[in-house]
Structures are given as C-alpha cells and as structure tokens.
Amino acid sequence: MAEMKSGDIRAMSEDQMDDAILNLKKERFNLRFQRATGQLEDTSRLREARRDIARIKTIAAQKRAGKTK
C-alpha cells in the first residue's frame, strides 16, 4: 500500500478510517515479523505504515473536534 495522502483520508468516512487503521495495524504486525525473521526487504514500509496510522488518527480527531464546535 502506498503512502496515503491527507486529501484522500479527509474524503473517507469514519468507518472507512477505522477500517484503514485496522488494515495498517495488521500490515505493521506482519512487517515486524518479517523484520524479525530477516525477510523484510523494504524497511521504509514500517515507517510509512506507522505514519499513515498517525495521519488517519489526527484527521479523525480533527473531524470529531469540528463536529462538536
């Protein structure tokens, strides 16, 4: 999965964001195992997945804060 753009994330619904976070967490779990066993070739993907999760969580929090104002 390529790096997610913030514009794409903002277009998602809350359910889609939750699904994306779940998928990224699963991917991160698998990548960590690959790294531990020496099978991981693209080590930068770990960083991208971690930052994608943070990006989605940040935008979700901004959306929630915008609704309450």
From Swiss-Prot:
This is Large ribosomal subunit protein uL29. Keywords: Ribonucleoprotein, Ribosomal protein. Belongs to the universal ribosomal protein uL29 family. The keyword Ribosomal protein applies. SUPFAM superfamilies: Ribosomal protein L29 (L29p) (SSF46561). The gene is rpmC. The lineage of its organism: Bacteria, Pseudomonadati, Pseudomonadota, Alphaproteobacteria, Hyphomicrobiales. GO terms for biological process: translation. It comes from the Bacteria. InterPro entries: Ribosomal_protein_uL29 (IPR050063), Ribosomal_uL29 (IPR001854), Ribosomal_uL29_sf (IPR036049). It comes from Rhodopseudomonas palustris (strain HaA2). The keyword Magnesium does not apply. One of its GO terms (molecular function) is structural constituent of ribosome.
